[in-house]
Amino acid sequence: MRNAKIVCTLGPASDDAETIRSLADAGMSVARLNASHGSTDHRRTVIDRVRDVDDELTEPLAVMVHLKGPEVRTAEIDEPVMLETGSEVVFAKGDTSTPEFVGLTVSITECEPGDTILLDDGRIEAHVRRVDGEEVVAEIISGGKLQSRKGVNIPGVDLDIELITEGDERELELAADKQADFVAASFVRDGEDVYKIIDKLEEFGDADIPVIAKIERAGAVENLDSIISAADGVMVARGDLGVECPLEDVPVVQKRIIKKCVDAGVPVITATEMLDSMIHSRRPTRAEASDVANAVLDGTDAVMLSGETAIGDHPVRVVETMADIVNGVEETDEYAESVEQRVPSAKDQSRTEALARSARYLARDIGASAVVAASESGYTARKTAKFRPQVPIVATTPNERVRRQLGLVWGVIPRSLEYQESVEHILEGSVQAALDANAAESGDTVVAISGLVSNIDQAQTTNMLKVHVAAEQIASGKQIVGGRVAGPLVRLTDGDLSDVPEGAILSLSTAFDGEFTGDIEKIGGIVDAREGMTGYPAVIARELGIPMLSGAIVPDRIAEGQTLSIDAERGVVFEGNVLRTPRR
């Protein structure tokens, strides 16, 4: 069970149904669709494929539509163009490029003499000499071959470009129509840009899609607090940051962004060239493995693969490798120590955060196996994850979209659960989900936390924190004698107690109509299939003061000798010993 999740970019190498399923089996939690490539109609088809795969899985598989944004690229050309070092080149809006003229998708006349123009992730560098009307004249400082449609960065220059392009509007309409789980916004400058995306989604009828803000400009780093406050998540685009900012600053900026996001309880994705060599190689470099490991140690919610899975030679192997690296790091003492030392504070006057933080330390102090969160909207689960408990967070929700969205959140195992009857029933179902997910074993202690639940009669229980024993309920009945006891099951047919072990739980069928012979002191508890409070077994139970239920049938699948627990006050029988000391 990994804490850090994996986001995979789908492309020509991976967007068929079979490969999507294989990627999910290998560890993909979120499928990213990059609108910078391909068509909107094709993305519509791929979303349907992802949904079909999600329907087949226990673990959630979410869809992220990543907007192209107001990017600046060079013109589309058939053959590379050589830009010679020392030559003078004109940059202007246009659809062609030559050694003397570089066509761009937008005008960059906001430049001033002395500004730097970087092409193709900084591989080609030019310095602006002058601006003549709509043309920017620059000297090539570091030349090279310019390929088709390469990115253009101008550090420190705020170009007058609309945040949401016509193409972005089509993608946002698609996201709303197909109920995408996330929208990632490129070139976000501040919190206001995030709100513009949300407003546009609302126009298209779905303002509930979480917006992930991609941090890729120096200005965005300066406005990080407002972006984190406005966004539902953050993506650290190290590649673009490495062009916009001094290269030596990027590792520290990455750590700063991750820490701020964790402190705010906002999911953060670490992206760009994490296993880039595996686009063609079957093994990553040692530096790449260290890069992934350090992001995990920093506390990132997710690590992202781009070209490695979109156009790589073996996308599934890349995901398997990423999962192996993450798992390896998370199993170390260094990782556990790092998590323990970085627990953020709860916000002032936030009841949910105070309870979530308490759940984290309560789970640690009592040796709980999991934190179980009943989280209809996902809010309580996300807040619980903020405090990074050292055990899995099993979050249940009746909302399938929320289930998929929680697949991006650190340490959360999301499960579907229909909410009905009462908060207590919801918690019981959530604990059972933890058992089914192998996050806890029968008899383990778990910490249960619940947020406000709508459409429930007892919804006044807005936030609740309790210690709970995780066990599979196998029978229920009416209390005859109270108490709690655990012992080996004995199915008694004739009343003979001579071979009954000490502390046995007697299961009596509806056909039992005799009396006990032998040492009745050996009986630990009684589960009687017959209704009634005055029969012979009830008399014995009262005489001995041992727990007893009536009208409770132990299923045939439970073998003799297997340990059962009776909780007579609650009227239930559990499989296993729920009274034992919790494991640590």
Language-model segments: residues:
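Short beta-strand/loop segments at the ligand-binding rim of alpha/beta enzyme cores
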Residues: M1-C8, T58-M64, Q147-I161, L201-E216, ...
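Acidic, glycine-rich flexible loop/linker segments
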Residues: V72-T165, E169, A439-T445, I449-G495, ...
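C-terminal helical cap(s) of enzyme catalytic domains, especially alpha/beta-barrels
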Residues: V46-D54, T309-T332, N463-K466
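Nucleotide-binding motor/catalytic cores of P-loop/tubulin-like NTPases across gene-expression machines
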Residues: A293, T380-R382, P389-Q420, G524-I526, ...
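Hydrophobic faces of well-ordered beta-strands that scaffold small-molecule active sites
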Residues: A4-L10, A31-L33, V63-V65, V183-A185, ...
